[in-house]
């Protein structure tokens, strides 16, 4: 059985497709969704959304939001998404190291918060590269 998934930002539809399985970046960990899942609304962390169809995973980097799950339909509402570019494994690893150092060297709460968001994005980028390679 397949389910429908839509990923939306305030200004556009990122994707509208079918999926065999969806894995969402929830605030308390990953949320796996299969067809027939119980109704649920959950907050999403900045991280990697994975959509599986015909044994192929498609990653999308989300920048926070929420998801509504209802049996055979998943609607993901996010603030923004980060486009996946042709980034290699070594570049993604370097970005993760740079983001980790920025968190460690942050001097103010705002710097730490901004660096933490960038660290989450860098982690999601590295995960996405691993799924695409």
Curated annotation (Swiss-Prot):
Protein's recorded name: ATP synthase epsilon chain, chloroplastic
Q: Which family does this protein fall into?
A: Belongs to the ATPase epsilon chain family.
**Its gene?**
atpE
User: In the UniProt record, does the keyword Disulfide bond occur?
Assistant: no
Work out whether the entry's keyword set contains Cytoplasm.
no
Q: Which organism is it from?
A: Phaeodactylum tricornutum (strain CCAP 1055/1)
* Keywords tagged on the record: ATP synthesis, CF(1), Chloroplast, Hydrogen ion transport, Ion transport, Membrane, Plastid, Thylakoid, Transport
Quaternary structure per UniProt?
A: F-type ATPases have 2 components, CF(1) - the catalytic core - and CF(0) - the membrane proton channel. CF(1) has five subunits: alpha(3), beta(3), gamma(1), delta(1), epsilon(1). CF(0) has three main subunits: a, b and c.
Q: How does it sit in the membrane?
A: Peripheral membrane protein
């Amino acid at each position: 059985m397949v389910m429908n998934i839509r990923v939306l930002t305030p200004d556009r539809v990122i994707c509208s497709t079918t999926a065999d399985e969806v894995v969402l970046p929830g605030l308390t960990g990953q949320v796996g969704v299969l067809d027939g899942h119980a109704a649920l609304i959950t907050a999403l962390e900045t991280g990697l959304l994975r959509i599986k169809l015909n044994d192929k995973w498609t990653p999308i980097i989300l920048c926070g939001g929420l998801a509504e799950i209802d049996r055979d339909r998943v609607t993901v509402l996010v603030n923004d998404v980060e486009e996946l570019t042709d980034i290699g494994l070594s570049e993604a690893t370097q970005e993760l190291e740079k983001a980790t150092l920025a968190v460690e060297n942050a001097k103010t709460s705002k710097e730490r918060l901004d660096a933490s968001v960038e660290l989450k994005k860098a982690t999601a980028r590295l995960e996405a590269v691993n799924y695409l390679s």
